[in-house]
A protein has these predicted regions:
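C-terminal helical cap(s) of enzyme catalytic domains, especially alpha/beta-barrels
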Residues: 70-80, 121-141
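Charged C-terminal helix
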Residues: 139-167
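A short glycine-centered flexible hinge/capping loop motif at secondary-structure junctions
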Residues: 93-94, 148
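Short coil/turn linker and secondary-structure boundary residues
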Residues: 17, 124, 147-150
Length: 167
């Protein structure tokens, strides 16, 4: 190793996927490609320019680097960067129906849910998972009703800002 070089860093980067890998994958499949772990608007724009089907805005649970920004912080920036060109899925921090509501308002087309389902499965098996799904949906519908949103399409960033009518 030369001065200032890190064997660990070099090894991690050696195995990290590149934009060339995305292009290679596009060349061997006709399946839609969705990239996970996109947090920066520049990366989102690059992915959109390559024609991927979607992005999963994720910080991998913050476990890889604990100072990684929260997905809710970066989602609006990523959404603005791609301007509706591709599907955005948010992964991380979804625990309640109001979290789903906020993610949709901030630009997500869908959310991924992990831990709540695992906890529900461990506690009560398949019935626990069904109950967790029902809770998320009920909480989302309540948040929609209280915000005056009759459909998912009506959930916009404005739904997160109190108005004179709600004061």
């Amino acid at each position: 190793l030369s001065a200032g070089q890190s064997a660990l860093f070099d090894n991690l980067l050696h195995h990290a996927p590149t934009w060339a890998d995305v292009q290679w994958l596009q060349g061997i499949t006709h399946l839609p490609i969705v990239l996970k772990g996109i947090l920066h608007p520049d990366d989102a724009r690059q992915a959109a320019s390559l024609g991927v089907a979607g992005l999963i805005v994720s910080n991998h649970g913050g476990r890889t680097l604990d100072t990684t920004p929260a997905t809710a912080t970066m989602l609006p920036r990523v959404a603005q960067a791609v301007g509706g060109q591709l599907m955005l899925i948010v992964d991380g921090g979804i625990r309640r129906g109001t979290d789903v509501f906020k993610a949709l308002a901030l630009g997500a087309d869908a959310v991924m849910v992990g831990r709540p389902y695992v906890y529900a499965l461990a506690a009560a098996g398949a019935l626990g998972v069904a109950h967790a799904i029902r809770l998320l949906r009920d909480e989302l519908e309540i948040a929609m009703a209280l915000s005056g949103c009759a459909t998912l399409d009506q959930i916009t960033p404005d739904a997160l800002i109190p108005t004179a009518h709600s004061a």
